[in-house]
A protein has these predicted regions:
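Mid-chain, well-packed structural core segment of small domains
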Residues: 72-84
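Core segments of cupin and vicinal oxygen chelate
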Residues: 12-51
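Conserved catalytic-core motifs of GNAT/GCN5-like acyltransferases
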Residues: 10, 30-36, 96-99, 123
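Exposed loop/turn and edge beta-strand positions of beta-sandwich/beta-sheet ligand-binding modules
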Residues: 5, 38, 68, 102
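Vicinal oxygen chelate
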Residues: 1-2, 83, 88-123
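N-terminal beta-strand motif that seeds the catalytic metal site of vicinal oxygen chelate
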Residues: 1-17, 48, 69-72
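A short, compositionally biased micro-patch
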Residues: 37, 47, 79, 99-101, ...
Length: 123
């Protein structure tokens, strides 16, 4: 077996419509086709690929107290526009430059408390 990359991220939420709005309106993903599963959800796309899957759950269950997913990360193309968009959405975030590199990072949480890292690497 060889892992070739990350296919998608799945988030369980009891706030499906608001979570869709966050990923669509704040982070700029596009809502797209989703198989006709027997449960509610949404798939959000970037560059034609469904990278965020949302599943509506009455009581989402997080990781055990023995382990945790700290965050996941997206690459972004416009650092300043991203800061402007997050500020306009009245979201709290932390932004900083990675020492010794040209990488700039922004950390923000969605309404479910999921930590998202946004990485900007100038070309």
């Amino acid at each position: 077996m060889t892992i070739t990359g990350i296919d998608h991220i799945n988030i369980g939420t009891s706030h499906l419509e608001d979570t869709v709005a966050f990923f669509r309106d704040v982070l700029g993903l596009t809502v797209g086709p989703r198989p006709d599963f027997p449960f509610s959800g949404a798939w959000l796309y970037a560059a034609g690929t469904a990278i965020v899957h949302l599943v509506e759950l009455a009581k989402p269950k997080g990781p055990s107290s023995d382990s945790a997913l700290d965050h996941f990360s997206f690459r972004i193309t416009d650092y300043d526009a991203t800061l402007t968009r997050l500020t306009a959405a009245n979201l709290e975030f932390t932004a900083f430059d990675v020492p010794g590199t040209t990488t700039r990072q922004i950390f923000v949480r969605d309404l479910n408390g999921v930590s998202i890292e946004l990485n900007y690497r100038p070309v």
